[in-house]
Amino acid sequence: MNYQAVIGLEVHVQLKTDTKIFCGCSTTFGASPNSQTCPVCLGMPGVLPVLNKKVVEFAIRAGLATNCRIAPRSVFARKNYFYPDLPKGYQISQYELPICQNGHLDIEVDGQVKRIGITRIHMEEDAGKLVHADVPGLGSGSGVDLNRACTPLLEIVSEPDIRSADEAVAYLRKLHQIVVYLGICDGNMEEGSFRCDANVSVMPVGSTTFGTRTETKNVNSFRFVKQAIEHEIERQIELIEEGGKVVQETRLFDPNTGETRSMRGKEEAHDYRYFPDPDLVPLVISNDWVEDTRLSLPELPDARRSRYRSELGLSDYDAEVLTATREMAEYFENCLAAGAPAKGAANWVMGEVTRALNEAGKDIAECPVAPARLTALLQLIEKGTISGKIAKTVFDEMWQSDKAPEAIVEEKGLVQVSDTGAIEKIIDEIMAANMGQVEEFRGGKEKVFGFFVGQVMRASKGKANPAVVNELLMKKLKG
């Protein structure tokens, strides 16, 4: 029997706010354990939570970017469970009335576009963290670090529309790109800023009844998500075919083995005994707030890619690379605003600029060559002042010295030679020294032409105008 996977993803997005969702404690990552806490996030008796307005704004931004309906009224709820890293004994979340509902994202896998529904986006606080290692002052064992407790999260819940690990990764990558573009999350998966719970079940092909699902918790890389889902699909099919039954449970992914393992029985919603939090009034969001937020959104990757193709004539590949990050797209567009040709700017940003950034271990936001300076370099190429080859040398000097390209060209005497008399003299000397290759060319071996071009460029130290060289060489070689 053939089986079909059914996958739904719950993505936890840690919001890039300076302070926590219900108190004023810092959200800075990496501080010493329990140094960023207060009575509110420690769950002390008598304290009251105060909602961080920035968290609501970020939630609205996420909802609009994922085509959700923004609820005019939403409610915070207490999710009750006991765990050492949850000091209050409950988590403040949203349940029946979340802030965002009924959205979608379109993904592309193997050239096919598919729409993945988004059930809801809700705000909640993160729990603390258990540290299983040598604890300073306590020796080996387990410690509880509550710095992360009360850190703001969005939980983005997809419909069970995903049918393969590849589709799951495509959806996750797109969602990751969007939240980073919006500036609401740093996207750092290693630090847990963007992590995923994967709900997986299998059913016979053609069936409309979903199988029993498992939930694999807190997978924090695209590669691990793919491995975890593929293993879970394989495990469930094998179990069913051997006559066993899939148990509804929570599982963990082990990156060392590439397998999932049982963690605990999977709870149902009623196990958490949700009820409205009496310490937080219902959240009312005006239409004006939503529309003001909509106007403040940056142009998102899909819209940018479409514009680059239709208005700038760029290829699908170029548009994809240039919109990979918001910073890359803005650097490219700043080049255009300074007067750079679209294709030339695209080639240089994807080529020399990216190469230099990778070698230096920098992000494009740290690029020492400003867009206006890169544009000035491209304009020197367009005018014929320097060749593309010389331009790369000039760029390297710009990277190191922060000098204008015009100054470097003048200082180093790099102006392109277009004087036909000077170029003809070089060609004549090279032909006289390589008569064997001249005869080969005239005998029909046209590949030799590249040899002569290389010799002329070498003799001119790269300064000869390639177009003039090609024209004069062809004329002289043909005799």
From Swiss-Prot:
GO terms (BP aspect): glutaminyl-tRNAGln biosynthesis via transamidation; translation
Entry-linked InterPro entries: Asn/Gln-tRNA_amidoTrfase_suB/E (IPR017959), Asn/Gln-tRNA_Trfase_suB/E_cat (IPR006075), Asn/Gln_amidotransferase (IPR018027), Asn/Gln_tRNA_amidoTrase-B-like (IPR003789), GatB (IPR004413), GatB_C_1 (IPR042114), GatB_Yqey_C_2 (IPR023168), Gln-tRNA_amidoTrfase_suB_CS (IPR017958)
Cited Pfam families: GatB_N, GatB_Yqey
Keyword terms: ATP-binding, Ligase, Nucleotide-binding, Protein biosynthesis
Coiled coil: none
Keyword Membrane recorded: no
Keyword Protein biosynthesis: yes
Superkingdom assignment: Bacteria
Catalytic activity, as annotated: L-glutamyl-tRNA(Gln) + L-glutamine + ATP + H2O = L-glutaminyl-tRNA(Gln) + L-glutamate + ADP + phosphate + H(+); L-aspartyl-tRNA(Asn) + L-glutamine + ATP + H2O = L-asparaginyl-tRNA(Asn) + L-glutamate + ADP + phosphate + 2 H(+)
Entries under Gene3D superfamilies matching the protein: 1.10.10.410, GatB domain, N-terminal subdomain
Gene Ontology molecular-function annotations: asparaginyl-tRNA synthase (glutamine-hydrolyzing) activity; ATP binding; glutaminyl-tRNA synthase (glutamine-hydrolyzing) activity
SUPFAM superfamilies per UniProt: GatB/YqeY motif (SSF89095), Glutamine synthetase/guanido kinase (SSF55931)
Known EC number: 6.3.5.-
Family designation: Belongs to the GatB/GatE family. GatB subfamily.
Record note on quaternary structure: Heterotrimer of A, B and C subunits.
Function: Allows the formation of correctly charged Asn-tRNA(Asn) or Gln-tRNA(Gln) through the transamidation of misacylated Asp-tRNA(Asn) or Glu-tRNA(Gln) in organisms which lack either or both of asparaginyl-tRNA or glutaminyl-tRNA synthetases. The reaction takes place in the presence of glutamine and ATP through an activated phospho-Asp-tRNA(Asn) or phospho-Glu-tRNA(Gln).
Protein name according to UniProt: Aspartyl/glutamyl-tRNA(Asn/Gln) amidotransferase subunit B
Annotated source species: Geobacter sulfurreducens (strain ATCC 51573 / DSM 12127 / PCA)
Source species taxonomy: Bacteria, Pseudomonadati, Thermodesulfobacteriota, Desulfuromonadia, Geobacterales
Gene name for this UniProt entry: gatB
